[in-house]
Design a protein with these regions (language model features):
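Domain-level recognition of nuclease-like catalytic cores that cleave nucleotide substrates
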Residues: 219-258
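Hydrophobic, Leu/Ile/Phe/Ala-enriched alpha-helical segments that form helix-helix packing faces
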Residues: 132-148, 200-207, 248, 252-255
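Conserved catalytic cores of phosphodiester-cleaving nucleases, focusing on short active-site segments
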Residues: 170-185
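Metal-dependent nuclease catalytic cores that hydrolyze phosphodiester bonds in DNA/RNA
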Residues: 1-165
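Short alpha-helical "patches" and their helix-cap loops
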Residues: 115-125, 211-223
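Short solvent-exposed loop/turn micro-motifs enriched in small/polar/acidic residues
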Residues: 163-167, 212-213
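Metal-dependent nuclease catalytic cores in nucleic-acid-processing enzymes
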Residues: 194-218
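Active-site-adjacent loop/helix micro-motif of nuclease/hydrolase catalytic cores
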Residues: 186-196
Length: 258
C-alpha cells in the first residue's frame, strides 16, 4: 500500500526509463522565466512548487477550498483553523502569496504524516520569492489557456487504485492531454515521466475512464524553465504500457487494457 510517488521509488525501471525523457518533445522558453535566481529565494523549493500549483488552480477558477484542500485537511488534522490564511489569499500580491505558502506548508501533514511537533511554519517569504511565484503562476495560467480547455484539476482516480498503489492525484486534465506541473530548474526525469504514465493508466482504469478517451499526450509544464515537455501516447509500445499496468501499478493480467 503506497502512493504513486512512493511506488516509483521502489521500482527498478529499464535503462533510460519506461518513458525515456529523451523521447519528450520539448518546447523551450515558451514563457517568461522567473526574474530572480532560485538561490535568492528563502523558501524550500518543494513548497514553492506546491504553492505555485495551488495558486494557479485557484486563480484559474477552482474554488480556493478545493485548490488547497490537502493543505486545509493538514491544518485540521493538527487542530488548526485555515480560515485566517484562506481569507488573506485574494490574488498575487505579496500578502496573498505569503499566506498561500503558509497554508501549503501543511500539505506534508497529509502526504507524509508530519506531526504537530515536526511541522515548522515557513519564514516570511522575501521579495525574490514572491516575485518568482507571481511570475510562475502567471505563466502557468497562460500555459493552461493555450493548451486547454482544462476539464479538471487535482485529479483523483476512483476505482483505479490497486492493492499496490492506493493513492495519488494528477494535476491537470485537458481535452486531449494529461499534464503535470513540475517547478524545477532541471528538465524532467524518468521518474516524472513514469508518474504521468501511471496517472493516465489509472485514469483509464478508473470509474471516470470516459474522461481519458480522447487523451492523446502526456506532458509536463515547468514554469521555472518556461518550457513544455510532452510525448504522444501512440508512440509508447503496448509492451511498456502492459508492464507498467501489471508490474508497477498492480492490475491483474485479466484486467489489463494493453
Amino acid at each position: 500500500m503506497c502512493s504513486v510517488t512512493q511506488r516509483i521509488k521502489s521500482v527498478k525501471q529499464p535503462r533510460g526509463g519506461f518513458i525515456n525523457p529523451r523521447q519528450l518533445d520539448v518546447e523551450s522558453d515558451l514563457y517568461e522565466r522567473p526574474r530572480y535566481p532560485q538561490e535568492d529565494e528563502n523558501i524550500n523549493a518543494g513548497l514553492i512548487g506546491i504553492t505555485t500549483d495551488y495558486l494557479t488552480r485557484y486563480l484559474f477558477g477552482t474554488p480556493i477550498e478545493v485548490a488547497f484542500s490537502v493543505s486545509i485537511e493538514g491544518m485540521r488534522r493538527l487542530g488548526k483553523s485555515p480560515l485566517s490564511l484562506l481569507n488573506k489569499i485574494n490574488g498575487l500580491d505579496n500578502k496573498s502569496i505569503s499566506a498561500a505558502i503558509k497554508l501549503a506548508s501543511y500539505d506534508c501533514v497529509v502526504r507524509n504524516g508530519i506531526t504537530a511537533a515536526m511541522h515548522h511554519a515557513p519564514e516570511k517569504a522575501n521579495q525574490s520569492t514572491c516575485e518568482n511565484i507571481r511570475t510562475m503562476v502567471t505563466t502557468s495560467r497562460d500555459f493552461l489557456f493555450a493548451y486547454g480547455p482544462v476539464i479538471e484539476s487535482g485529479i483523483g482516480f476512483p476505482g483505479g487504485y490497486t492493492d499496490v498503489v492506493t493513492s495519488g492525484d494528477g494535476d491537470y486534465l485537458t481535452a486531449n492531454g494529461l499534464w503535470d506541473m513540475k517547478v524545477s530548474k532541471r528538465a524532467p526525469t524518468k521518474d516524472h515521466t513514469l508518474q504521468l504514465l501511471m496517472y493516465w493508466l489509472m485514469g483509464s482504469h478508473s470509474s471516470l475512464n470516459y474522461k481519458y478517451a480522447n487523451v492523446e499526450k502526456l506532458g509536463i509544464y515547468n514554469p521555472r524553465l518556461g518550457s513544455v515537455f510532452s510525448v504522444e501516447i501512440d508512440s509508447l509500445s503496448k509492451e511498456t504500457l502492459h508492464q507498467v499496468e501489471v508490474d508497477v501499478i498492480g492490475y491483474k493480467e485479466k484486467d489489463a487494457l494493453f
